[in-house]
């Protein structure tokens, strides 16, 4: 019923490049949807694990995403603009002033990034929601 947030991923640059693009060696880690806390080590596309960010030396697991409830509410509201699209991967940034900024919505979001950090396939979960009537 309504919009369902299926997964959330924390993405960041690797310390050498400023991009968070996973396929250009950005890092990705799973966020607990309920709490907004990062629950897995980050990985890169070579599946190297990072418990500590290589440049900032900040701990990754346990990091609390700022303004998490606002992020969830923002993407749910945005998803209602086109309710006939059953699957959207939202790229969202939290600005320094706390403002939530939607960068883009992807109707062909990359499934790698939601599955590699915890090594759990997501298709059964997604299929159920995408095809429910």
Say what each PLM segment does:
Residues 36-58:
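Extracytoplasmic/periplasmic proteins that interact with beta-lactams or build/remodel peptidoglycan
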Residues 51-70, 80-85, 94-133:
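C-terminal active-site "lid" helix and adjoining low-complexity regulatory extension at the edge
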